[in-house]
UniProtKB/Swiss-Prot annotation:
Keywords assigned by UniProt, alphabetized: Cytoplasm, DNA-binding, Repressor, Transcription, Transcription regulation
GO BP terms, alphabetized: negative regulation of DNA-templated transcription; regulation of DNA-templated transcription
Basic and acidic residues bias: start-end ranges: 79-89
Lineage, uppermost ranks: Bacteria, Pseudomonadati, Pseudomonadota, Gammaproteobacteria, Vibrionales
Subunit: Homodimer.
Stated name of the protein: Trp operon repressor homolog
Subcellular location: Cytoplasm
An example molecular function term from Gene Ontology annotations: sequence-specific DNA binding
Length: 103
């Protein structure tokens, strides 16, 4: 009998991360699961989506600012284009919270 991996679907990984957040173990989990290069790539991807949602810079400018290839920006742009307006609004809310009103 062939053994199956415990985690075979993306949703299972998302559930694991959610559980780790609830237990305040998410930093440990994500650090353990991702190499430094993968964490750096994820930070770049978050910044790509953030900049694309802001819409103030061209893809070339984003590429230069973040030090990533234009193809990486294009992939992020294409993924964003495939999302519904509701999903884009939710992403914008996550990535661009309103400025704090603290004085």
């Amino acid at each position: 009998m062939v053994q199956q991996p415990s985690f075979s679907e993306w949703q299972q990984v998302l559930d694991l991360v959610k559980q780790a957040v609830q237990q305040e173990q998410h930093e440990m989990l994500l650090t353990m699961l991702m190499t430094p290069d993968e964490r750096e790539a994820l930070v770049a991807r978050v910044n790509i989506v953030h900049e694309l949602l802001q819409g103030e810079l061209s893809q070339r400018q984003i590429s230069q600012m973040l030090g990533v290839g234009i193809a990486t920006i294009t992939r992020g742009s294409n993924e964003l284009k495939s999302r519904s307006e509701d999903e884009k609004a939710a992403l914008a809310q996550l990535l661009m919270p309103p400025p704090s009103s603290e004085a």
